[in-house]
Amino acid sequence: MGKLSTIGRIFFGIAIAVLGALTIYYDDFPYMLIPPKHSWIPGFAIVAYIFGAMLILAGACIVFEKMIKQASIILGTMLFLIFCFYFIPYQFIKSSEYIHFGAWENAAKELSLAGGAFVIASRYFVNKESLLNRFLSKIISTGAILFSITIISFGIDHFLFAKEAADYVPSWVPYHLFWMYFTGTALIGSGLAVIFKIKVRQIASLLGIMIFIWFAILHIPRVVFSPSADLGSEIASACLALAYSGIAFVIAGGATKKIV
């Protein structure tokens, strides 16, 4: 892997591991990993510990390149199954706001992490002539598309909820609404570019840089100055930004590599 992909892989692995640590520390899942109403799950604390440990292990495997293909495939599959068989039913059955685009934001975050795990796996996957490997190659080849679709949806959110989200921009940055619309445009354009393979290396690199800048100037200060009641959510949001930046860098670094 090139330097850009290596940086992205490490970013993503760290983010996943920290999400796992948060799950164990708070005896609960970060807000985007499963829907909020999960009290029906028997032995929930034990489930949270096991899931958190799996995230830490997967993150460590990704960072240190140990069984990284297997860890990434398992991680991506697990997150994708949660999206399909928990988030989607929850949105239609339990949530009364499923017709509103913004109500799907957390589900999209789950899907983006699943796509990111498949992107990582695709960089280490070597196709062998077996039914299982052909099946796996089809699944992991969707990673960049899944990630790009969610990035586009986040861009649309920046337009739909620009005024509500403008306060997230640091106070010392002028023209808050401009930056909301600029970021939304950049996210939508980047997602479309990756899907349609238009200057993927350059645009994915710029996407990763943009998200990392927001990670540094927006999310880190919010973590540092957050009240204790909100600290877990702010750390989780920072992890998402770091993960997205990492995924974009891995896509950029592997833009010339044919997935087999």
Task: Pin down the residues of each PLM region.
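Membrane-interface interhelical connector segments
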Residues: 26-40, 132, 159-176
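Extended, low-polarity transmembrane helix blocks
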Residues: 1-28, 44-57, 63-160, 178-185, ...
